[in-house]
Amino acid sequence: MKNDDLYQKGMEIRRTLHGEESFKKSNTVTYGDPLMTNFIKVATTSVFGALWARPGLDLKTRALVVMISDACTGQEAELHIHMIFALKQGWTQEEISEVLLQLMGYIGAPKIREAMLIAVKVFAEYEASLKSAKKASKKSAKKPTKKSTK
């Protein structure tokens, strides 16, 4: 695949993982700075376009794998992002919690404690975003249509 193709595939995958609103926000807020724009272009091509797009694992499994990697290496900011990806790909809060607890015997309680504290925040944010989206959906469904008066 050419770099342009990898970049486009990476953009599709990032959009899928983030969701449209979060994807747009990350591109303008997090990656709006020229330095960060260069970072995300390379990451979109080489990580999302080349690695996440590989055959053999679905996005749901890949989201869990990177979340586990972040917990094991203490990458707290990335863990936050990838935990949201895992939730959006269908992993439940209970499954994510159990995965983290399973890791405790292998990477230690301190790292898992930090990961669990992040999970508390992520789960609360995720629940709030679901409620907000549901509320917005109900509002838009209730809006009366304007009748034309001729």
Question: What is each model feature region?
Answer:
Residues 1-59, 88, 114-150:
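Acidic, glycine/proline-rich low-complexity segments that act as flexible tails and inter-domain linkers
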Residues 43-47, 64-69, 99-106:
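Short alpha-helical scaffolding segments that buttress acidic/His motifs in well-ordered protein cores
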Residues 55, 69-76, 105, 109:
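Short gly/ser-rich anion-binding loops that grip negatively charged ligand groups
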Residues 64-67, 71-97:
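Mid-chain, well-packed structural core segment of small domains
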